[in-house]
Amino acid sequence: MDMGHWYVYLPLRRLGHEVYFYDTVEPEEKDYKKIIEEFKPDLIYCCLTGNKSIAPHEPWKEILDETNSGRTKTFNWFCDDTWRFDNFSSKACSYFSVCSTPEPAYIEKFKSIGYDKILLGSWHANSEIYSPKSFSERDIDIGFVGTPTLSRRDYLVDNPIPVEIIFNVSTEEIFAAHSRTKIGLNLSVNDNDPEGGTQMKQRIFEIIAGGGTLLTQYHKGIENFFEIDKEIVTFETMEEFNKKAKFLSKNERITKSIAKNGYQRLLDEHDSKIRLSKLLKQIEEI
């Protein structure tokens, strides 16, 4: 099931909204214009990628027509601005009434090209679909949920620190794995970025929603969302990762305290319902 179902559709329904979920991979009704005319939405909430290989039914023309008509607000949630701003986001944003970026530093980049209707759209996680276990019940000491790509081998395979890798599993098993993990590892480098840069990852919020301690590769701007060394732990080098992973593994009291603080911050500010409610209000005000 698409993460949009768990992190957008279900929370919006919980907030009391009537929502039509259009699957851009294999939609039940392929005539998007027909859907608009029948459903008559107040807002068209999108996460369009421009990648036909993964989402062959993205309705770009229909979205642009609706934006230009002025009768319905259209919105796009951009995900990968650190490496797709120049060749995608900077061009696609004009199709929508308003857009968001997960990168604080990219707000000004959008404005510099004349697109002012840009919002900071923080990643978030739906706490209602996780079942955090007590630390004594957690059977994964250090875990990484994701594909062990070549760039991640140094941390996941060629390293004396044992990391349990969870991949090629169902979405429900991903939620369960985060809820069973004491220390959740996030690697922020994006393999699709030719320059090997880091970016904000949804995994950051998923680890914390599962109740574990987040140990994450540092990415500029993460301190806008969590307090470093109180709610999360960051590293920039392999040596720093090894040192902090060993420390957290040997000091469970501190590890549990950081996990508790991070989880409370997520519930207060980064739970899907809270983030989406705030985002909808910002969209309405534009």
Question: Where are the model-predicted features located?
Answer:
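Nucleotide-sugar donor-binding catalytic core of glycosyltransferases
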Residues: M1-F39, C46-I63, F85-S90, S94-I228, ...
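Catalytic phosphate/metal-binding cores of nucleic-acid and nucleotide-processing enzymes, i.e., regions
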Residues: M238-K246, G262, S272
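Active-site proximal beta-strand in glycosyltransferases
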Residues: D65-D81
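A broad detector of short, well-ordered amphipathic alpha-helices
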Residues: S179, F205, K243, R253, ...
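A charged, aromatic-enriched C-terminal amphipathic alpha-helix characteristic of glycosyltransferases
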Residues: K250-K281
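Conserved acidic donor-binding segment of nucleotide-sugar-dependent glycosyltransferases
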Residues: I232-M238, F247-E252
